[in-house]
């Protein structure tokens, strides 16, 4: 049987404060059964993507604050949960610049897999590609989770929503690399004749895998996570991605999600998808194109 999905439309037919989608977020959460997800006194992980340096279209802080306030009203102890891309200090600085902090959101922002993405628990998935997933410790130990996902396009899975937010965003760096390697077995290919020696590729790498030698990129294949950020940062096609195997990527993501969700009771997870600012690229990208469809609204479900 299909799960019920509740929708809060983006269009406001009457210009009244009470009709604002921000104001109506608590009603949406109530309709989907948030009171069954939040247990008084228990921590509640509010999982969301904090964006990248240069991006600008993540979920707006005022929406997140409404979710936080609702959890508090129900007696829960909310915290914003995200995993390392750069190290925790750099990522929290990016989050603060974008308006995600204790003052604006009303709860702590926690990098749940530790300073360098090494704090995790191994969980079996039963999958074929990702047999074991490294679930971030802060997710593993949380009794409840509310998944706030910004719906976008994606270069490998075509669509990015709750599955990508959980499968990639709730796991430690080692599992992120494993999933990326499922589609990109080899590191980016470098064409020296096209290189303008601008250095933008090195700035885009969050993993220290790309260094400049005489202003030309040199990739360490051991450190490279195959995220392909450097290829998107290169405007001269000097760094290009190898031919991808996208079916493997989507399967690996799904297997990772299965492992993450196995650490929760099924009734203790709620999914909220923001179908607004739907860009062709996901929020990991260092810059984002204009939205490809008009804003639709916010979807909420227990599945």
Where is each model-derived feature located?
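Extended, low-polarity segments enriched in aliphatic/aromatic residues
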Residues: 2-48, 53-63, 69-303
